[in-house]
Regions:
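N-terminal glycine-/charge-rich "phosphate-binding" loop or analogous flexible N-terminal tail
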Residues: 1-70
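Rossmann-like dinucleotide/phosphate-binding beta-alpha-beta segment
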Residues: 155-179
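Phosphate/diphosphate ligand-binding glycine-rich loop within oxidoreductases
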Residues: 66-145, 156-160, 175
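Short gly/ser/thr-rich secondary-structure transition/capping motifs
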Residues: 49-56, 71-75, 147-155
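Generic structural signal for helix capping and beta-alpha/helix-loop junctions
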Residues: 32-34, 100, 123, 150, ...
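Short, well-ordered beta-to-alpha junction loops that form the rim of enzyme active sites
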Residues: 4-6, 74-76, 172
């Protein structure tokens, strides 16, 4: 198992407790430089530590990938992972959704892809969803415009009363059920 994520000692112990024969290689942060070079700045700045530039040589990183049969990854990921990990059979991604993998070469390949759907903090995302509903229902975008303009135009507000309304939640997975 090759971990491209920074994992804690507790997480390492949990993985190795599954089977003592598991060889776990911790390469968390090793590929950050490559990720920074291949993803837009807004992505790498948000998801990578500011001083993360990777570790090891290109040859060492290529060797790690070439030998990996199972990879634990995250977001953002290496776009050319399948091409470089010829023995790869299984890629597990920590984020819940897999559609973000469309950009890379894993999508549509022979590699089994799994995600951590259901093990994240879905309640926090559901609360952000409710906050978004309230944001627009109460006219907060107009309030921002008024604040910038330095005046309040009460006629521009059309707040919506949410009480008694019915909402349709499409795709009621873990987050949708919490909403």
């Amino acid at each position: 198992v090759l971990s491209l994520l920074r994992i804690t000692a507790e997480e390492r112990a949990m993985i190795q407790a599954v089977d003592p024969a598991i060889k776990l290689t911790d390469a968390g942060g090793w590929f950050d430089g490559e990720i920074r070079e291949t993803w837009p700045p807004f992505t790498s700045e948000r998801y990578l530590p500011p001083d993360a530039n990777g570790a090891g040589s290109q040859e060492e990183r290529d060797h790690l990938l070439a030998e990996a049969e199972v990879i634990l990854g995250g977001w953002p990921f290496l776009l050319d992972l399948r091409a470089r990990a010829k023995k790869l059979k299984w890629f597990h991604q920590r984020p819940a959704g897999a559609s973000n993998l469309l950009r890379g070469d894993l999508w549509g390949s022979d590699v089994v892809v799994t995600t951590s759907r259901g093990s994240g903090n879905t309640l926090a995302m559901a609360e952000y969803t409710v906050a978004g509903i309230l944001h627009f229902a109460k006219g907060l975008p107009q309030a921002a415009v008024d604040r910038e303009a330095g005046h309040f135009d009460h006629r521009a507000y059309r707040p919506l009363q949410i009480h008694g309304k019915t909402a349709l939640v499409v795709g009621a997975g873990g987050i949708g059920q919490d909403v």
